[in-house]
Design a protein with these regions (language model features):
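Interdomain hinge/linker segments and adjacent boundary elements that couple functional modules
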Residues: 3-120, 202, 206-225
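Amphipathic alpha-helical interface segments
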Residues: 73-105, 117-225
């Protein structure tokens, strides 16, 4: 006894389509029924666990160059959007050509936890230039640089991430860059970013924290060398 005869769903809609074609029906009617069956199967098909996920390397740079509104947060390192070439080399990223932070109508909001100012890749000799770069970009039109003080972190920052418009999110792991495009996931990361944004200080207060870190770097490097 077949599944069709017992009223149980078959796994492939083409099985039902073949039954329609075996009946002596008008060709147009067969195609109409087949179309309805395929639509019904599509609506009830289980969502793939990897739907809306991409592992293509370099996707973040491309997204950042095309997006009008970019939000980035890092917990323990300088956000990649703001890297200098020297910082990138010390971090083992090779040649680095980040997206332009200027452009009419483009907005960037970049947050970093206070500890990120003190994480030194390599010998740390890249840090004075990197911290100086943070001060420079914080004054660019269309760029908001925020520092989340250590004592007010709204939640444990498990990893850094970047949100591009309301279209995609990139997350970097030790082994790969993950791009998420599912609507719910992009919305969730947007809400998480808003929490860090509310906790961060901006403008002169943020620059004061960066300048404090720069003084610490100079003193420490002077002591080492």
């Amino acid at each position: 006894v077949s599944r069709v005869e017992t009223g149980r769903r078959v796994s492939d809609p083409e099985v039902v389509a073949r039954l329609f074609r075996a009946l002596e029906l008008d060709g147009a009617e067969v195609e109409r029924l087949v179309g309805l069956v395929r639509e019904a199967y599509a609506l009830t098909a289980p969502r793939r666990s990897d739907a809306g996920v991409s592992f293509r390397a370099g996707a973040g740079v491309e997204l950042a160059r095309g997006a009008r509104w970019v939000r980035a947060f890092e917990a323990v390192v300088v956000p990649r959007l703001l890297w200098t070439a020297e910082y990138a080399a010390a971090a083992g990223a090779g040649d680095w050509a980040g997206p332009s932070l200027e452009g009419e109508g483009r907005r960037f909001c970049v947050g970093v936890a206070e500890g990120g100012r003190r994480t030194w890749p390599g010998s740390g000799e890249c840090m004075p230039g990197q911290l100086g770069h943070l001060l420079e970009v914080s004054r660019l039109e269309g760029v908001r640089l925020g520092v989340v003080p250590a004592h007010v972190t709204p939640r444990v920052p498990l990893h850094g991430f970047t949100v591009y418009d309301d279209a995609a999110v990139t997350v970097e792991t030790f082994t790969r860059e993950i791009t998420l495009t599912g609507v719910d996931e992009v919305r969730a990361y947007g809400e998480i970013f808003e929490g860090f944004e509310r906790a961060a200080v901006f403008g002169d207060a943020a620059r004061a924290l960066v300048e404090d870190a720069a003084r610490e770097v100079r003193e420490t490097l002077g002591f080492i060398h």
